[in-house]
């Protein structure tokens, strides 16, 4: 068994034991073909300053919206921005698609599938 097959076996094992709840606006497709449809959308609230003379403004991030309270045996799939905010808030039950991983599959510049998740 190659390391990749071993990794996929571990992912499939986790999928059986742990429930993944996708709170991104898109269906997440794993390289092995497993699809996780969106069940909601978690976002980070934001406010913007006025634009300066160069057309640049500041963004200020606030609380996470649309993310349920922690649930036993559940990992919430969220965007990288939401994951960062969740980690800052002490949440350990969130992951994001591994879109920057070298095994991420792209076609015509768009992500087709990811090999797994990042914590």
Please place each PLM-identified region on the residue numbering.
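Intrinsically disordered, low-complexity segments enriched in small/polar residues
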Residues: 3, 7-19, 23-27, 31-119
